[in-house]
């Protein structure tokens, strides 16, 4: 009987140890909720109220503002395409992919890494252009010194100069796009519309990138041919030459300081 009572007491003791923290936590939570309810009228931080009201425009100024807002949203949605096709990113990404294939590398470096390298190199090359756009377009617009039309013109001019400067030595792409648009032969940059200059720049960048790719492939093709001829002379026809030539390609690329040489030539090709 005494043992039974002792067991019951021990059981009640352990139960109280288990449930007492839960009750204490619940009671503390109730107190905190009560305090929160008392201080509910005292917000810790002020959050601005934002209201999007869709209604009929009352004045012509409201109509113009709505159109400008739609144009701004359209420009923001086109920002990735502008970054990919109207900057140095197109040439850089294609050339980096060419060097990866010329070295017979399948997964190293990954495609996402190559695109990241091309993106930051493009930002590095385009930084003076972006700085000029910020100083002459974005900052005056935010300060209220110019309107949206003037800001657009000032932002467009540095990009047009950059694209036209790349095609100054070979304006064949400009002539081709001007002829397809049935426009007269331009004498200056101002005579080339932007909707013609952009596709001409894209065609020029594709042409230049493929020309660079040809020069990148030539030394590594020679290595492949030498390795293949040696394997055939030794009777190892079933052995893939790519597996044997890959280390020699890597050694050649490292010995000539390939990455620094490639990035340096790409950078100076835009100057």
Curated annotation (Swiss-Prot):
It holds the Pfam family FliP. It is a multi-pass membrane protein. It is found in: Cell membrane; Bacterial flagellum basal body. InterPro entries: FliP, T3SS_IM_P. The keyword Cell membrane applies. The chain crosses the membrane at residues 11-31, 70-90, 113-133, 190-210, 212-232, 236-256. Its main location: membrane. GO terms for biological process: bacterial-type flagellum organization; protein secretion. PROSITE patterns: FLIP_1, FLIP_2. Keywords: Bacterial flagellum, Bacterial flagellum biogenesis, Bacterial flagellum protein export, Cell membrane, Membrane, Protein transport, Transmembrane, Transmembrane helix, Transport. The keyword Cell membrane applies. GO terms for cellular component: bacterial-type flagellum basal body; plasma membrane. NCBIfam families: fliP, PRK12797.1. Belongs to the FliP/MopC/SpaP family. Plays a role in the flagellum-specific transport system. This is Flagellar biosynthetic protein FliP. The gene is fliP.
């Amino acid at each position: 009987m005494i043992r039974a009572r002792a067991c019951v007491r021990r059981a009640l003791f352990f139960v109280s140890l288990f449930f007492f923290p839960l009750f204490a936590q619940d009671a503390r939570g109730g107190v905190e909720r009560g305090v929160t309810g008392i201080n509910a009228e005292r917000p810790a931080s002020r959050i601005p109220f934002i209201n999007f009201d869709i209604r009929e425009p009352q004045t012509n100024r409201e109509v113009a503002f709505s159109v400008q807002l739609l144009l701004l949203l359209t420009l923001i949605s086109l920002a990735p395409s502008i970054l990919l096709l109207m900057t140095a990113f197109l040439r850089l990404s294609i050339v980096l992919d060419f060097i990866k294939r010329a070295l017979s590398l399948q997964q190293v470096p990954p495609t996402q890494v190559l695109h990241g390298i091309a993106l930051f190199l493009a930002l590095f090359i385009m930084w003076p252009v972006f700085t000029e756009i910020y100083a002459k377009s974005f900052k005056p617009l935010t300060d209220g010194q110019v309107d949206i039309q003037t800001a657009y013109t000032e932002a467009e001019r540095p990009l047009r100069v950059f694209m036209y400067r790349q095609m100054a030595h070979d304006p064949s792409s400009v002539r081709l796009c001007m002829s397809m648009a049935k426009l007269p032969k331009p004498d200056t940059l101002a005579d080339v519309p932007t909707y013609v200059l952009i596709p001409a720049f894209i065609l020029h960048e594709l042409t230049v990138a493929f020309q660079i790719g040809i020069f990148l492939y030539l030394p590594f093709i020679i290595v492949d041919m030498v390795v293949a001829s040696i394997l055939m002379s030794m009777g190892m026809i079933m052995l893939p030459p790519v597996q044997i030539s890959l280390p020699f390609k890597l050694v050649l690329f490292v010995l000539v300081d390939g990455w620094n040489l490639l990035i340096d030539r790409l950078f100076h090709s835009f100057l």
